[in-house]
Amino acid sequence: MKKLMGSCLLLLSLMLISTFSVSAATKNPTKVNLRIGSSRQNVYKSYDVTGDSKVDQFNIALGLNGKIDKKDSNGYYNNIFISINDKTYIMKSATYFYGAKASLYTLANGKPYLYIDAITDNDYHAVFGLFNYDKSKKKMVTAVNFTTLFNGYAARCSGDIVKISGNTIKVRYGLMCYSLGGCTITYNYTYKNGKLLRTSYYGTLVNISKGQHLTKLLTAKRTLTAYKAPGTTQKAFTIKKGAPVKIMQVWRKGNSMYIKLMYGGSYGWIKAATANTSQQFSDVMYVG
């Protein structure tokens, strides 16, 4: 009888251990839309956000000046609080915002990223990008900042995830470009050596806003010089004022940005404008 009791207890122990192991391990869906609430609301307990393939307990809340769940008299925040397994990480913003949205994206290799978009007035973005937990630093870090890629060449920039394929993320940027006005450009980022990196300097132009229409056909507002390749000084041709062109592609590297276009059947690259006072095309929508 004692042997039978001992065998039953051993079997029960093994079942408990097995059950705990199964519940502790998890595999995230590719995308999970998250709710941002107070520090006591929307606590998630079914997903891995630290990248160790184990379930984490986490939630995302907003706050003001280091105080969670607080906002100013106008309803604005300047902090995002990410609480993971009883530890809280604060994202501070120099710009006040009135709300935020978040999603959890996971690559094929199991690496999770939090997508956070804190929205402020006039469609600007105070905090906007992909964030991940850095095990060596033991804190949340920025993986991709959507607001900085086109610094110096756009008045504002936003971005969203349009596709995940394996370990590659396609990001669609919406920007108010000094050269093209309102336009949409996509870049791919792939996981390599522990980081999300752009796969190319060449971005795909999706469209340009031309009034109520989307297009790639524009008209030169002034004489423009086209080069044979981005970053070179070899001239390809000169575009006359008033001439029609077709915008093809963009190139962004370091502090430089070039735009590929077709003019009279020939292809060339122009330097992107760095200020909206030096407009290159006459029929695009510019908003400051």
Model regions and ranges:
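Sec-dependent N-terminal signal peptides of Gram-positive bacterial secreted proteins and lipoproteins
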Residues: 2-24
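Repeat-based blade/solenoid architectures
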Residues: 31-44, 90-103, 148-159
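Calcium-binding loop positions in Ca2+-binding modules
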Residues: 46, 50-54
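Glycine-aliphatic tripeptides that mark coil-to-beta-strand junctions in extracellular
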Residues: 53-57, 111-112
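Beta-propeller blade repeat segments, especially FG-GAP/WD-type strand-to-loop junctions
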Residues: 70-92, 128-139, 187-192
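Short aromatic loop motif centered on NTY/YTY
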Residues: 99-130, 139-215
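SH3-family beta-barrel domains
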Residues: 195-228, 241, 274-288
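SH3/SH3-like beta-barrel superfamily modules
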Residues: 238-287
